[in-house]
């Protein structure tokens, strides 16, 4: 079973992603609502990290650069921001993929599988 860390401050979106990922019992899902909480939880090993760009205490893009210091697992950004500058910056700071909210469950699964 793959371990996934969801870093998302919107509780409803985090709940939806958790539901999608746990449907087939393919993922053990851990959630963080802030960059600080994510950094604490990231001490453990994960197979994939799903990361929001807009976190309350730090940019998800900056957090990605920090996570890259000790994680080489895929990092997928999930954000409602769909402008080119944000997407390019997220990928340049170590993101492996970028999914725009709202997203389809099947697309989320396909993107995760493509990056694992």
Annotate each language-model stretch with its function.
Residues 1-116:
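N-terminal/domain-start alpha-helical segments
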């Amino acid at each position: 079973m793959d371990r996934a860390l969801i870093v998302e401050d919107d509780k409803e979106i985090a709940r939806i992603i958790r539901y999608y990922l746990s449907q087939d019992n393919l993922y053990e899902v851990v959630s963080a609502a802030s960059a600080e909480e994510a950094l604490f939880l990231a001490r453990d090993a994960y197979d994939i990290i799903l990361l929001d760009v807009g976190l309350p205490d730090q940019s998800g893009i900056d957090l990605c650069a920090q996570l890259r210091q000790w994680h080489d697992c895929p990092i997928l950004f999930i954000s409602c921001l769909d402008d080119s500058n944000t997407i390019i910056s997220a990928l340049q700071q170590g993101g492996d993929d970028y999914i725009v909210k709202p997203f389809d469950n099947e697309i989320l699964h396909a993107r995760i599988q493509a990056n694992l």
